[in-house]
Amino acid sequence: MPEPLDLWIGKDEVEGVPSQPRQDVKPPPHWRLEAVVATERPRSLTVAADGRTAAFVQDRDTSDVWLLELGAGAPSRLTTGRDPAPYWEDTEPRISPGGALVAYADQGSVWVVAAAGGPPRKLAEAGSPVWLGDDRLVVSVERDDTSRLAVLDVADPWPRPLCGSKPQATGVPGEPGIERYGDESEAAVSPDGTAVAFAFTPRHDLLRTEIRVADVASGAVRTLTGTPGLADKGPAWSPDGATIAFSSERSGWYELHLVGADGTGERQLTQAGADFTAAEWHRGGGRLVAVRCRRNRFDLVTVDAATGEVTVVAEGGSWSSPHWTEDGAVVATYEDAATPSQIRLVRPGERPETLHAPTPLAVRSAPHVRPEDVTFTSFDGLEIPAFLFRPAGASPARRVPAVVYPHGGPTSYYGDEWDGHAQYFLDKGYAWLAVNFRGSTGYGRDYERRNHGDWGVGDTKDCLAAAAYLRTLDWVDGRRLGIFGASYGSYLALLAVTDDPEHRFRCAVAKYGDCDILTSWAQGDREGVQDMGRMMAHPSRDPTAYTAGSPVHRLGNVQVPLLIAHGELDLRVSPKQSEELVQELRRIGGKAFEYVTYPTEAHGFLRGGLELHFYRRLERFLDWYLM
């Protein structure tokens, strides 16, 4: 792994003084950060219409597109130099129905490249391409401060709106009786290519997402589903074009539902008390493949389209992006706590076959710790789920320090997935507690909405309850606890040391997070602002909630050192948030903190050298204060 160039690192300070290396930091016996950072991640898998070829993204220093002939050897790299993209926001590459072209998004534009190889061609400023025949694409474009779907001719790439009438800027129902001011996403083209199903979120109700269908020729739109304050997502056409499957949270879980393409006959298909995603119909039409979430373990399942019966094809771990192959098998990506991301082929009754696993031997040979599912009680009696990793050798006679890790989002989760950075620190002797605080997904709608209107209050107390739980374990040294998070997890880490009169944590790490959610609301990109509005409403409606959720007002309470890190190109959480935090710490005085910025990085440290630099800084910081 090459060392990061100095010009890739902006500020690197300890209380305003240039940071200096430590000579006494030693790696653990079995793991190296270089190997963790070098572990490539195949993801965002799609399969061609004939079921023979897969396209996927593989993260390294870039997020390039690769092709894999199913059952025919090693994959081939199709693009070079595609910008690194965070997996949680990137879109899938798509193979044209005839197999000649691959479409993908990069640098704010849609591109196509010959599947046989060659230079890519930029079509238009757009994203999320989906093929409409072999010569057109449905893409997402930004118009009137909304995300709209458009049709793009590959030969003459000028986008025209998919939906015929202009959105209504008032946010009230428009012609012809259909709300038009909102965001269109998740395009799914009908088998005959005459219609596109999509998800629509109106601006006046950000909790609502409905399924709509647009006629490609006329632009006429009809609404198939929708309930105030609830979401329907992920439309998928049946092979005969008569039925659309989708996930809906109406029951309290994202169960699978079916509706006729004409809007009739809607019914709930599954009754599993679980979330289902990524549904795709079998070519025969009688069943679907999907991913079922089971307390943030993600099983690969099939669902009978008539009865709703769920059959487990392969348990998680974490399965994602499942697709049918030509011969009725399923290809999907898989990972778990001991297995980095790989592409697998699954046939009923057989062990999954690994098709592509770009894991370094240094990682394959290293010992992995699998987590234990635990729960603990928070301040109000709510049971909080978490994954607890116990390092080898931890015992009452050899008590270890521990790190509490709240995930980002907040509408997200920590699942049974590969976390090489956690494994590295486990090998050093740290315990690791990954907390799915209130507001996390995977535990039902009521749990997910527990933090609405309450950012930084109840969920912070969940993190404090995590520290209290760790103190009950006789193999954890309760005096040596740290908290580390990224994005929303960074925000909670900061709150955990501003709003805790017991001062449970000895140090905290804030990686590209908020310190003032009111100014962050003003600074953020459209998606971030809408996400905040969905959960916290407009600041003018409840300014006290924004104040209560902003740790910058209470930094005088901080009694422990902070490590603060931010990318200077971050649009989701502006780097001004960390600047504001540092300025206020300096104004108060007497606070210990370290501050590092990265000029080339956005929301996520994606380039290998800079990721390595940050985790070395993290190691140095945690070792100094906890080891």
Can you annotate each of these PLM segments?
Residues 4-31, 53, 57-77, 100-101, ...:
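Beta-propeller blade-edge and WD-like acidic-aromatic loop motif
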Residues 20-33, 165-168, 176, 326, ...:
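Extracellular/periplasmic ectodomains of large secreted or surface enzymes and adhesion receptors
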Residues 37, 79-80, 124, 163-164, ...:
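Residue-level detector of conserved, well-ordered beta-strand and adjacent loop positions
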Residues 39-57, 82-105, 123-142, 166-202, ...:
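Conserved beta-propeller blade repeats
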Residues 160, 374, 404, 433, ...:
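Hydrophobic/aromatic beta-strand patches that form the interior of the parallel beta-sheet core
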Residues 202, 408-409, 487, 568:
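Residue-level signal for short, function-critical loop segments
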Residues 358, 362-479, 486, 520-530:
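Cap/lid segment of the alpha/beta-hydrolase catalytic domain
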Residues 437-627:
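Active-site-proximal cap/loop segments of hydrolase catalytic domains
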